[in-house]
Amino acid sequence: MTTIVSVRRNGQVVVGGDGQVSLGNTVMKGNARKVRRLYNGKVLAGFAGGTADAFTLFELFERKLEMHQGHLLKSAVELAKDWRTDRALRKLEAMLIVADEKESLIITGIGDVVQPEEDQILAIGSGGNYALSAARALVENTELSAREIVEKSLKIAGDVCVFTNTNFTIEELPN
């Protein structure tokens, strides 16, 4: 798996992820790019789960964004509907965190769309709970920027989770 975390603070949203690709107990690659910009750089997206499945979902989500003029929630709900009803999509094993300047969402592998708690922190993947806990503690107890919180949360997850490394890709809006 992996770790993807998103923090929204002081007018910025940051999504970051590690670069480890594992096959069973073997590390296959350490520098995968699991966080990307979509829709002309206006949407951030990060994935956890099967790499090929995630790229399929990135493509489908970007099509939904184009179809709905970049409306994040509408695009996510439409993707989730397709994910639940299409036989081929139902077999995809991945989760996405998506964010624009206004909102952040998780799109789950069973076709659910989840909005964050009031703290605007989201995390997915095998190290997601570690990163989420770290990010919440840092938001509540420091004045760090959203980017610094994402970096530190990923570092903590990478130190604890064997399926997460410390080779990070981090994107932020506004840029």
From Swiss-Prot:
Q: Which domain of life is it from?
A: Bacteria
Q: Name one GO molecular function term.
A: metal ion binding
**A cellular-component GO term for this protein:** proteasome core complex
Q: Where found in the cell?
A: Cytoplasm
* Sequence positions that bind Na(+): 158, 161, 164
Entry EC no(s)? 3.4.25.2
Locate the transmembrane regions by residue number: none
Active site positions = 2
How is the protein's activity regulated, according to its record?
A: Allosterically activated by HslU binding.
Catalytic activities: ATP-dependent cleavage of peptide bonds with broad specificity
Question: Per its UniProt record, what HAMAP family does this chain match?
Answer: HslV
Free-text function comment from the UniProt entry: Protease subunit of a proteasome-like degradation complex believed to be a general protein degrading machinery.
Q: What family does the database annotate?
A: Belongs to the peptidase T1B family. HslV subfamily.
Quaternary data:
A double ring-shaped homohexamer of HslV is capped on each side by a ring-shaped HslU homohexamer. The assembly of the HslU/HslV complex is dependent on binding of ATP.
This chain's protein is named ATP-dependent protease subunit HslV
| Organism field | Haemophilus influenzae (strain 86-028NP)
